[in-house]
């Protein structure tokens, strides 16, 4: 019998408790990551929503930025939600002048895109790999403006003024969503990430 993977949640900002609860409910050993030593034991990492510039600064302050970036380069699975998507993006539109990202996803993200358009909203979307539509919650969320050839689009907004916008992607061992899958009790997107981590072990 294979032991469950240990998956960390970047715990310096964002919906940390909600992500930990989702992962634990899926039978995973889930831990809060605030120090490099905690990152070292993780087979995968969730980067939650929050404020992306603040997250980057906190990661620098707590000596986590470069260790996370290096682990991602080495192939550690990571899953970014909302601001976490921005943190994993290689390119940002409407970012601050000195904004840093961890990178790894060959995507261009527009920061706070839904914030200017429709503020926060909820809606049903189809996600590749899920057997039924997902109720997605967007909170001043980014969207993906462009993807590289090796990026798989997992979901788009289906209705309203943002219809067609890309809101979930995967590239290799990295996943990201514009929406907050930890809100609302549906653990299927987290299950996709747990399966990804398990495949990569």
Swiss-Prot record:
NCBIfam families given in the database record: PLP_synth_Pdx2
CDD domains on file: GATase1_PB
Residues of the active site: 82 (nucleophile), 180 (charge relay system), 182 (charge relay system)
Binding site for L-glutamine: 50-52, 111, 139-140
Family, similarity comment: Belongs to the glutaminase PdxT/SNO family.
EC number of the protein: 4.3.3.6, 3.5.1.2
Position of the signal peptide: none
Key words of the record: Glutamine amidotransferase, Hydrolase, Lyase, Pyridoxal phosphate
Reaction(s) catalysed (UniProt annotation): aldehydo-D-ribose 5-phosphate + D-glyceraldehyde 3-phosphate + L-glutamine = pyridoxal 5'-phosphate + L-glutamate + phosphate + 3 H2O + H(+); L-glutamine + H2O = L-glutamate + NH4(+)
A cellular-component GO term for this protein: glutaminase complex
Domain of life assignment: Bacteria
Functional note: Catalyzes the hydrolysis of glutamine to glutamate and ammonia as part of the biosynthesis of pyridoxal 5'-phosphate. The resulting ammonia molecule is channeled to the active site of PdxS.
GO MF, one example: glutaminase activity
Listed pathway(s): Cofactor biosynthesis; pyridoxal 5'-phosphate biosynthesis
Keyword Hydrolase: yes
Gene Ontology process terms (BP): glutamine catabolic process; pyridoxal phosphate biosynthetic process; pyridoxine metabolic process
Designated name of the protein: Pyridoxal 5'-phosphate synthase subunit PdxT
Subunit and interaction comment: In the presence of PdxS, forms a dodecamer of heterodimers. Only shows activity in the heterodimer.
